[in-house]
Amino acid sequence: MTDTATGVHSNANGVEKVPTPVFSIEGEPTQETAPTRMDPFDRPKNDNDPFEDALKRCHKILEKLDCPFVTGKEKDLDESDDMTENEDHDEMANEDDGIPSNEKKVETRKMDCTSGQLLAPKLPEKAESISSASESSEDSESVAILKYTVRTCYAIWKKRQKNSEIALKGLMIVLELCLSQPSARDDAFSALLETLGYNTVTFWKAVVPQIYNSDLSYATQYREALLFSLVLYDVNHSKNRLRELYAAVPGVRQSMLGIRAKQFGERYRHLQMKIARSRASSRMSSKMGSEENLPAMASMMNDVVFDEEPHTQSPLVDMSHDKQRVINVSNAPPVSISRKTSGSWEIKQGSGGLVACVDPVMSADKKNIWLSNLGVNMQEELKEHSTSTNSLGLPLIKQACAGEVFCVLERNEKKEELTPKQQAVESDMSLLSVLNTYNKHSYQLNPVVVNQDDYNTYYGGISNGLLWPALHNLPQYISPCFDDPELLREQWCAYVRVNYLFAINAARNSRAQDFIWIHDYHLMLCGQIMRSLESSLDIGFFIHIPFQPPANFMTKYKTVADPIMRALLRFTKVGFQTSRDRDTFVKLVAKHIKRTKIEYDSRLDRYTIEHDGWTCSLGVFPVSIKIADFVNIAKNPQTIIEAEEIKKQIMGRSADGGQLFFSVERFDYTKGISEKLRAWQRYFEKYPDRIGKDVLFQVAVTNRRSVDSYRQYQDDVLAVADLINQKFKSEDYPEWKPVIFETDGLPRTRLIAHYLAMDIGVVTPSKDGMNLVAKEMLVCNPTASLVLSTGAGTEVQLSNAQFYSEQEGKCYHRVEEISNTEAFADNFFAAATESKETRTKHGEKINQFLCVHDIDEWSDQFLDPKWTHEVISQCEVKQLGQFYGLMSRTAQVRRQIVECVLKGLPIRPHFRYSLENAKNSLESSCKSGTKLSLEADEESGEEKGFEITYDIHDELSEMEKDLAFLAFIQSDEYENAEEFIKTLGSFYEGGPVLFKNEVKQAAEMLQQGIHYNTFFTDRDGTLKSYACSYPTSVQPAYSAVIQAQFARRCATFCAIVTTAPLLHTGILEVATIPEGYYAYGASAGREWYLNPAQQFKDRSFSAIDLNLMNKVFDIIEELLERPEFRIFKWIGSGIQKHCGHITIAKQDVNGTIPSRKVIRLYEQLVKIVNDFDPNGTTLTMRESDLDFKIYVKAKLKGRIFNKGHGIRLVRERLKPNMSKGNCLVCGDNESDIPMLEECLKLAGSKVYTIWVTADTNLQEKVTQLCDRFSCSNIHFVSCPQVLLGAMAYATAHTLVDERNRKLDYYYDSDTPMDQEESSTLGASLGTSFGN
């Protein structure tokens, strides 16, 4: 047999075995003895136990290394081989893939080789080594050999010296054993990973090719076993070691998730849409009217489809994605599958709480996908795999077992006697055919097929043997077999394995825009596993049962409990049925999971927990029912007639005044049926006058009879029911029975008829997630009374809604503790004697509440992203820290928007909600118009009572533009760019017409340059209007996209040169363009940033000068702490320390600071500069409209470093060729003139320049400067949005020109295009904001 999760082969007895080895480790194979293909793992040729073989081979390796394992003698590793030395660890693992560099290192250990016990110093606690407590004494030495082999071989291999290849073979022997028995040897695999430490990436690079070779030659399927082993390790240790494998072999992740295929499918679909749109024009319809062109057009996009970094490799990308789907994942399917006597498969709509809850959501869109196990799994069969190579040793195309899973869905037996027509009928009867038919008329139902043994262990073991009773706080029903740690570990491996299969199926079926919804306790690990496969997935989890584990759950069952708690924190959001369940989870996290940050938002009733770099939102969502379905049946005349007949049939044998108590549930020990019957018995003992009157009609649908605990419980309950009927009889009504007990389920119509017939509904579970029966009862029959236990989630919901309070009245009969038989019996009596008027009054109140809070509300609220941490919540902004924090979060959201647009990814609704909430928060916090008054907080360091007022007109306006941009960017309209430019005109003070004319004139000049070899521009005032404060001058998403697209389509080297610093309230914190489009020249070009690996600074000033500037900065900071000058910290750029100068804001954009205050600040600054530099040799001070700047003079000539010097610096370091090609320069004030002058010196008349200014003096200076260099390409615009509109317009028309040129070439030329031309055309066939 083959484990579908790991690919491990087993014999008929279930013992795992490795394929027959072909290459001995004794020495290199000779020509006479060498096999056709060499075994990369050097396995000996025998059928012995693989564990024993591995031990023998370990001994041989150790002998070759002259480090034999000696029994009874301690063996110390040489100190020079200490595993804490990781100086040669792989840099890619340590940096590029984010592997923590501060991870605890493995210390050298001594080992008692007689007992196999580990002596001090020990491994770190995180390293889960093989526990001697769980091993038999005869295995202890064998385990010690494996560990010793790993440590010895690693110490030699990592030095890359003599015998390193032999040492690597030793490590591979241990690895092979782990992969051949992944469930039995997970502890050895953990020890191997911990020993390798930072060298795992290097190790995988060396070993994975051998694993692939083994799979190809011997059908070992070790690749799948390796993936599962890493998943199991990550789950058990809360790590992500899978990323190390991705770093070593990037193709592994892509093949696992089918990334290439999904990308191609998306792009191909979009290309078809574009072709369809293009056919609307007469020219395209005549030349593209034939479908024969479609494959040719698809081939044009091949290169574009597979770009790993679209924002640096491909032009504008398409945003016409499919809308978000829901990928629903559950253990149980929404259908019931059976095979008729004729042999054909039949699919019927399933029943149960999960189906009732989720089916309305799934049915809303046929593209939604439901993944579940259909009960058709891999059977335990011994299969001899056919050879995977031919007679020449070459690999066969189709490996053994390649179609094994699909055979499960088809009829396995071949009926050769059937005619072709009969075989076609037989095919139509196959399960696969039935599923396909089902999917045509509903959402997509995809089966998850697993090994049947694994499924049985996962379902009957951890899921229902441990988690089900534990989470219901019924420890007495936990299977005693889990007291054995070894058995618990084995069953836990099966649980992980099945979760892994569900997770990888869900990841493969999902797209970036989809929401993946995991359900219930069977699949608690899926979130963590899926996030290790693809970290950007949006995954939610809802637990339908209670979360009330016993007190010892986290200690006695730590093997299971700890990983599950950590795994739940990897979901984006987790939903609970009740606040009681959520509070229990939060308390357990706070107590048992270290390094967590827990926050509660009372307005949203949301907990947010941060752990290990992941954030999870916890909410409460009481499940409900589809009201209309029940009400329609209840109001049906036929149902009403049937209810009357039921009432007459049952109560016709009772005395007048009798009450019909009705209860329906699964025959489960969590439902409190046993306690209910004992209370019913006590009821008649306490109140004998009710004998002969009241009847309890109990429906308990039998299930899980194969589980011992269930079978015993059900038999005991039935015995109690018989005892009650024998004990209580009425002489006046001899046919009366106190209990009517049914074990068969009722059809929905019949069930609702019983709801109408009952007088009192009884729902008294010991623990239940919600229990929808109670809601069904009062929705159908609002005149009925309800006996409800506190164990039901419905009771918690009704209690929280004040339906059981002194103020609102007690609208139901609450059973506090079902084990309290006396009180339970009293509740029965109170319900039986309650007046009909009171009963109706209370029932109708609950009925109205339930009709409002139906199933649609439940699913809508859970699926709504607004309540999660990913969306900025609406709040009142009162303090400076809140304002800056809110704007910082909008910067994060805008970066995500820009990245999605540039990469062609779908725009998630989270982004719009976040910007809307941020905008509404600011607007509602303004006291008058756009004036926002803020007070000091602890983060600002200010005293209480200090208040500052900002005019946030720019911040609000930019958010409004971004919201409009989001609406246009998701449009499929061809001219969405042009339409958005028109929308920008609505924000223009001069009106849309004037804006359009300005944009057109500026765009015409931009188009004259056709393509710019270099592009240098200022930011604030040029590309971005001035904000009230630099920390709030976040670059809008629309602006970032326009600039990025212009840089990609219209220029070669682009740089933003600004006087702001890089960090510490600098350009990198407020910019939202991804790396790769622009270089940033901060501090007037004195410090440059392209990416983390490319940064450089000006070194023209000495350390003494820099120290002097730092002292001046400290004194100015102290000055601005004084109350009369404090205002200058919070306006404009505040106080900033740059590379080579200091900036101090003197005025805001609205000119609200009185001139007398500005003069006093100026005088103080002059005094400080003169005190430190009385001769003026080092420092100099300059003044602009909004700032004071104190510069360190250039080293040689005492000049101020300006943007012209910054251009020189970048030319020296990056060497852009400015003498060839056109150069574009944009600015808005005099500090930008040196930048223009430097470019004119280099490019002369090839310079094109646009200035954002209405200042005639500045315009004259720019014009005169250009005249000096015979440059006439000058244009002035009134505001940044005009410049951005011109850039967008020029970009769009550049695309149109290129598209037309390519299409003319394609259709008018008989010469086929080469690959580069083909991919360029395919990439150019798109909308202006889309590819």
Curated annotation (Swiss-Prot):
One Pfam family matching this protein? Glyco_transf_20
Top-level taxon of origin: Eukaryota
Task: Mark out the compositionally biased spans (Basic and acidic residues).
Answer: 39-50, 102-112
Please provide the record's keywords in A-Z order: Glycosyltransferase, Transferase
Xref: Gene3D superfamilies:
1.20.58.1800, 3.30.70.3080, Glycogen Phosphorylase B (3.40.50.2000), HAD superfamily/HAD-like (3.40.50.1000)
Region described as Disordered: spans on this chain: 1-50, 71-118, 1312-1331
Protein name, UniProt field = Alpha,alpha-trehalose-phosphate synthase [UDP-forming] 1
Function summary: Catalyzes the production of trehalose from glucose-6-phosphate and UDP-alpha-D-glucose in a 2 step process.
Member of which family?
Answer: In the N-terminal section; belongs to the glycosyltransferase 20 family. In the C-terminal section; belongs to the gob-1 trehalose phosphatase family.
Q: Which GO terms describe its biological process?
A: trehalose biosynthetic process
Task: Specify whether Transferase is a keyword of the entry.
Answer: yes
* EC number(s) reported in the record: 2.4.1.15
As its record notes, the protein acts as a catalyst of: D-glucose 6-phosphate + UDP-alpha-D-glucose = alpha,alpha-trehalose 6-phosphate + UDP + H(+)
Q: Which organism is it from?
A: Caenorhabditis elegans
